[in-house]
Amino acid sequence: MRAMKASCPGSCGELFQCVVDGEEFLMSYGIEKKSQVVIGPQTGAIEEVLRPKMLQVINELTDQIDFGYTFHTDISVGKGYSSSTADMLSILGAYSAYKHGTVSVPLLTSLCSKIEPSDSVGFSDWTVMNPLNGAIQWQTRWKPKLYVYILEPDQMVDTTSFIRMTESPLYPAEQSKTLLTDFKIACDKQNVELLGAVATRSALLNNKRLPKPYLNDIIDLVNELGLLGVNIAHSGSIVGILLTEEQLMHMTELEERLSHHPLASYYSLRNLSKILYDGLQVKNVEEILE
């Protein structure tokens, strides 16, 4: 039996997150960090340790680990990179392909949501979904060529411990519901400026629930340089500065300004990523696991 490899990208938080009629929605985008799982026949070798949520979610499909596997990821945990969703989708995708020869991203995403609130990183099209049950609200085939400069603090947080938007008295849910409409308009018009405005507004609204240090300073700098906007991990600690390909020419000045600001010591890890549209990818592995 041929081994199967599945990979799923992480995300720099969410492009936006909102509440509409008491229901929570979000849209995540892929970045150049991923989780990867290979599943094949058992070999008797000592296997790597799977993360607890990967074991929890695979139990939704099988009650026995009767296969060999390897697991690798370069996604940091406890920051808002969608690491758990990427991990869970990778093992579910590899297992589904290995055992059943078919993979349904909507189904697997809904299984992830049973374990914890999840992100839409498994979809190759931008997908707005309910993180609590994985239900799809809206999708677009528009794939703008964008980049994100990720600002990451050293601090780790329990991204599942925060009060949900629908339950937080600090979150302006009524104001947030227009984010979904405005996101759809931006996509239908294929207007990246509107897209950036949606992301920035979502970040500011969420700042009342989970404040990000220096967020207003970051937004001011982005506006000064004429960049696209700012997005955040709404239940995490990372911040993303969104750029078009043409705006990459401002990267040197952007980093220069950031490095001389007090925020540089807090967001000490900073790196540029292309925004990807890979979603969950599954393929055959030529060699059987040894």
Model-based region annotation:
Residues K79-V105, V121:
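DPxDG-like acidic metal-binding loop motif
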Residues V103-L228, T244-E290:
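ATP-dependent small-molecule kinase catalytic core of the GHMP/sugar-kinase superfamily
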Residues N216, A233-G240:
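Small/polar glycine-rich anion-binding or flexible loop at a beta-alpha turn
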Residues M1-K79, D278, E290:
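ATP-binding N-lobe of GHMP and related small-molecule kinases
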Residues P9, S28-G30, F123, I150-D154, ...:
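Short beta-strand segments
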Residues Q36-V38, L227-A233:
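Short, flexible, solvent-exposed loop/turn segments with mixed acidic/basic and small polar residues
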Residues C12-C18, S35-G40, V121, W126-M129, ...:
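Short beta-strand scaffold segments in enzyme catalytic cores
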